[in-house]
């Protein structure tokens, strides 16, 4: 698969890509997605079942930097695999559970839906 380098310092490739005519998320949109986290050897740290379906309001909630930036590149229905260096993931402190200090991560993310914030 052809990897792309983001302007934000991580690599990614599309597992499933949809038409470019669909929009990417904007500030305040609600995203529904699921994802898994693996280490650099592709050993699963957290599966999609472990992490369950996620809801995130774009740029209004805490999320590790790489995932926040990665979601901005995605369209509804896409699955993308990201390779995040540790500073874009959990950095020096890890997640204080299964992710240790300075661990680069592979995240496979499926963006299920984007609910746009309609102006009133």
Predicted regions span which residues?
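Cross-family detector of peptidyl-prolyl cis-trans isomerase
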Residues: 1-120
């Amino acid at each position: 698969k052809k990897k792309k380098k983001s302007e934000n310092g991580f690599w990614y490739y599309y597992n499933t890509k949809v038409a470019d005519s669909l929009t990417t998320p904007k500030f305040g949109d609600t995203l529904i997605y699921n994802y898994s986290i693996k280490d650099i050897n592709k050993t699963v740290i957290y599966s999609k079942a472990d992490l369950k379906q996620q809801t995130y309001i774009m740029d209004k909630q805490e999320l590790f930097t790489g995932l926040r930036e990665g979601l901005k590149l995605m369209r509804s229905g896409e699955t993308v695999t990201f390779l995040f260096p540790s500073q874009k993931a959990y950095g020096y402190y890890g997640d204080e559970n299964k992710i240790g200090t300075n661990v680069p991560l592979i995240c496979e993310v499926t963006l299920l839906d984007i609910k746009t914030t309609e102006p009133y």
